[in-house]
Amino acid sequence: MVIKAQSPAGFAEEYIIESIWNNRFAPGTILPAERELSELIGVTRTTLREVLQRLARDGWLTIQHGKPTKVNNFWETSGLNILETLARLDHESVPQLIDNLLSVRTNISTIFIRTAFRQHPDKALEVLATANAIEDHADAFATLDYNIFRGLAFASGNPIYGLIINGMKGLYTRIGRHYFANPEARSLALGFYHKLSEICSEGMHDQVYETVRRYGRDSGEIWHRMQKNLPGDLAIHGH
């Protein structure tokens, strides 16, 4: 186990998460007692207690007063906020994790984009217009793309869609900085934003589904061609 965290709390958090991931602390089992665990990791019990509370909030553990702390099956109890952690823990599963993330984005955005165009077209067009003054480099496009999907999610009038996109932000923007380094990807995205603006302006709501699905397929093809050059630290740093 290689842990790069800087602070004692950060080290303890990484140690426990990696131990859960590697089944040293297996899901469904009881975590070692506080005193034993603090000595094992090399942190104070106060620090450990803070870390355990944080991990419980993220769904890794269940803490009940007067009972031992239980290790959860995090797939069933955690939220989108652990995406980056999962990518950092298991490099081999990163491509599949990213495919799943992008598939979810495509599937839910066909719904919220159409709803935004129907319910709040002016707001949707305002969001899409931000693409008109974009600088032609990867970082700018990664931010723009995230903000467009997020903006359209909130423009749908259902803030839950926006919260889902918020939960994807960390890993999504890391992918974007790599993906949008490709000029073909930037060109495809601009064409997509322009087409969406056209659809919204002309009220052609029935075209949203196929337009979004096609963009998902086309961008997916570019991404898969690029994956062999995927940097190993895509989601490792900046935890």
Swiss-Prot record:
Homodimer. GO terms for cellular component: cytoplasm. The keyword Lipid metabolism applies. It comes from Enterobacter sp. (strain 638). Residues 6-74 form the HTH gntR-type domain. InterPro entries: FA-response_TF_FadR, FadR_C, TF_FadR/GntR_C, Tscrpt_reg_HTH_GntR, WH-like_DNA-bd_sf, WH_DNA-bd_sf. Residues 34-53 bind DNA. Its main location: cytoplasm. Keywords: Activator, Cytoplasm, DNA-binding, Fatty acid metabolism, Lipid metabolism, Repressor, Transcription, Transcription regulation. This is Fatty acid metabolism regulator protein. One of its GO terms (biological process) is regulation of fatty acid metabolic process. It is found in: Cytoplasm. GO terms for molecular function: DNA binding; DNA-binding transcription factor activity; fatty-acyl-CoA binding. Multifunctional regulator of fatty acid metabolism.
